[in-house]
Amino acid sequence: MITRKTLSLNFLKPVLELEYQIDQLSKMTYKNKSLNIHDLTALKKQLIKIKIEIFQSLTPLQRLHLVRQVDRPTTLDYIGHILDDWIELHGDRGGTDDPALIGGLGKINNRTVVCIGHQRGKDTKDNVLRNFGMASPGGYRKALRLMKHANRFNFPILTFIDTPGAWAGVDAERLGQGEAIAVNLREMFSFNVPIICTIIGEGGSGGALGIGVGDKVLMLEDAVYTVATPEACAAILWKDSKQSLEAAEALKITSYDLKALGIIDDIVEEPLGGSQEDSLLASHILHSKLVTELNYLLSLSSDKLKELRIPKIRRMGTFYEG
């Protein structure tokens, strides 16, 4: 049985109830071999059927709640499964080392890459340390330092996006949060090396964009990407955060909506039940996709990369008025 680290979401309760029944019956079958194994098999088939029904009909808001669960794989979880010889690098060379945005060197298929990503915590204490994945200006400047390092030594860049947004405190504004993100956007347009950005959880506003300019933008199936959280959007437009369900629908935050709109390039399939169900399988699928995309981008010249990158990102700002 899967151990849930947090209280389950309401829409997952049928799954939890069946998992509990399967767990109890498995223990009984182990102790008493004469018990009918067919009952256990039937329950497992029923569990798969229920999961398919639930996860094929998730609302945008349910997907958002799903990716906010603490048992969902983080950047460091994916790095541990995807990269070899990982070495984390620290500091922005300006006096700070933000734990909410991590980066370093590693190898994927024997090719050295620079990997950068938002890092959420696994529990309350860790989340406080990581500021819930909300990076400070120093975090974005650290990311820029590492990306410049990658550009200098011709290392491809991989970024993993998972943040509710950039840190919005008074100190963040005082230290130049907007400027730090804007400089990252400008510089990422100019790099000569391939850049692949993957939204692994919550892609929130400018905090996501600060490491989100890429030649390929991938998105995990259940991840979300939005200019503002549905709660914030509802509070702004309707003065009522309870309207977040309608806001989530209108914002088009899911991978399928964003693929149709041309905001992302491709959707990375997740295991049934989400990446938190099987982080190893989720990492294997993502690894395979990253290798495929990286091999393609490495076949292009640096001039061609930039020629394609700039209009691709600029098209994201296109909209139509009804």
Curated annotation (Swiss-Prot):
Keywords: ATP-binding, Chloroplast, Fatty acid biosynthesis, Fatty acid metabolism, Lipid biosynthesis, Lipid metabolism, Nucleotide-binding, Plastid, Transferase. InterPro entries: Acetyl_CoA_COase_a_su, ClpP/crotonase-like_dom_sf, COA_CT_C. Signal peptide: none annotated. GO terms for cellular component: acetyl-CoA carboxylase complex; chloroplast. Its main location: plastid. It comes from the Eukaryota. The keyword Chloroplast applies. GO terms for molecular function: acetyl-CoA carboxylase activity; ATP binding; carboxyl- or carbamoyltransferase activity. It is found in: Plastid, Chloroplast. It is an enzyme of class 2 (transferase). It catalyses: N(6)-carboxybiotinyl-L-lysyl-[protein] + acetyl-CoA = N(6)-biotinyl-L-lysyl-[protein] + malonyl-CoA. GO terms for biological process: fatty acid biosynthetic process; malonyl-CoA biosynthetic process. Pfam families: ACCA. PROSITE patterns: COA_CT_CTER. Residues 39-296 form the CoA carboxyltransferase C-terminal domain. Pathway: Lipid metabolism; malonyl-CoA biosynthesis; malonyl-CoA from acetyl-CoA: step 1/1. Its EC number is 2.1.3.15. Acetyl-CoA carboxylase is a heterohexamer composed of biotin carboxyl carrier protein (accB), biotin carboxylase (accC) and two subunits each of ACCase subunit alpha (accA) and ACCase subunit beta (accD). Component of the acetyl coenzyme A carboxylase (ACC) complex. First, biotin carboxylase catalyzes the carboxylation of biotin on its carrier protein (BCCP) and then the CO(2) group is transferred by the carboxyltransferase to acetyl-CoA to form malonyl-CoA. Belongs to the AccA family. This is Acetyl-coenzyme A carboxylase carboxyl transferase subunit alpha. It comes from Antithamnion sp. (Red alga).
